[in-house]
Amino acid sequence: MLLKFRSLFIVMIPILCWAGACDKNDNGAPVGDMPDPIKIDLRSTEKDMVSADQAFAFEFFAELFQEEALDEDKNFMVSPLSLSMALSMTRNGASGETKEAMRKTLNMDAFSDDDLNAYYKKLKEALLKTDPSTKLSIANAIFTNQSINIKPDFIHTNQSFYDATVKAVDFGHPATVNVINKWASDNTNGLIEEVIGGTRPEDLMYLLNAIYFKGIWTSEFEKKNTDRRPFTYENGIRENVDMMKQTAKFNYTADENMQLVQLPYGNEAFSMMVLLPAEGKKVQDAVTATRGEGYWEGLKSGLHQAEVELSLPKFKTEYSKRLNEVLTKMGMGIAFTNGADFSAMSDAPAKIDFVKQDTYISTDEAGTEAAAVTTVGMMMTSLPARPEKVVFNANRPFLYVIQENSTGAILFMGAIKNFD
């Protein structure tokens, strides 16, 4: 089976398509006699959630692909998992129409908040155990405005189910941006060093999810086989790139839309699925196909072992994107307006100011290193009333009273009239 990458292609690294939080598996054990992946047992409802998560992932990617279509040769990568987790934490602070819009956008409107939160918690715990040869870290954090009261139930829920680190900070201080960016860098092994450029006093909070992944191919490419080979863009232009090559047994399938090969990492708990559009078709055609109901699972059901003569280019992509417009198209536009209802988060009227994702991926002969940070910036739509500014200059005679505040009991009273 000959599989050469002659045009643009889509790569997917399913982290079992699921979620986690402020924990990590950083064993990085060498690939060899690895234990079998730990099977993740799911209840019927949880399987439905996985399917809903996958549908959201393909819908999100397709909408973003359309938005990036003007720049035909632009590489980009996103993490649907990171986005869904960050928005799920945010959803815990939403109420009414805003909450329903977010649930529908995430394709999770059929499930209760309790079920969703428990689902992410369960999957996180399983993800971090399934492959000791793969480094995996998934972290959540919430930075809140120290001047504003945040509702305890909102904090408790996100700490309990998402292991979110919560820290109250001064958004008016110029150094606060460094605290948030350092958290992002620390939780992506330094791959993503900056996610915001500054903070403002009117910011209510920042909710962040970070994912770091480093996987070693189960069947590594030999560097001696990598050489410069042509890669053909969709406009017909050819460019020589570093093309890795190997012939080995991989799971493979194909239909009228694309070829699909599955490249496993470590003990095969994780894999990169590479989708190559069929001859004469474009990446847009493959993206459109994946949006079809049941298409992805149907395609994967055809995977079978074949001896694949594989050519895959080395690649590295860094990407940053504000997602407000895409998420608005997907149905949660109300969350970005002054009509948003985040009353389960705080009594201060607030809306989502922005949702932004920063990503990094590098794939070479040894494997893949990837990271993503999703940042949800919340801002107050009306600032709390500022205290009246007055001048109190006791430069003339005055009285004073010393009292116990809760009862008003007066302990001492006096007058200051002179300083002779």
Where are each of the predicted segments found?
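Detector for small/aliphatic-rich hydrophobic stretches
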Residues: 2-9, 16-17, 22-171
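Non-catalytic, conformational "gating/processing" segments within enzyme and secreted inhibitor domains
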Residues: 73, 113-278, 301-384
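Extracytoplasmic/secreted cell-surface and envelope-processing proteins
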Residues: 98-102, 282-284, 319-321, 371, ...
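A structural signal for short secondary-structure junctions
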Residues: 266-267, 352-355, 391-396, 404-406
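C-terminal or internal capping secondary-structure element at the end of a domain, subdomain, or sheet
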Residues: 397-420
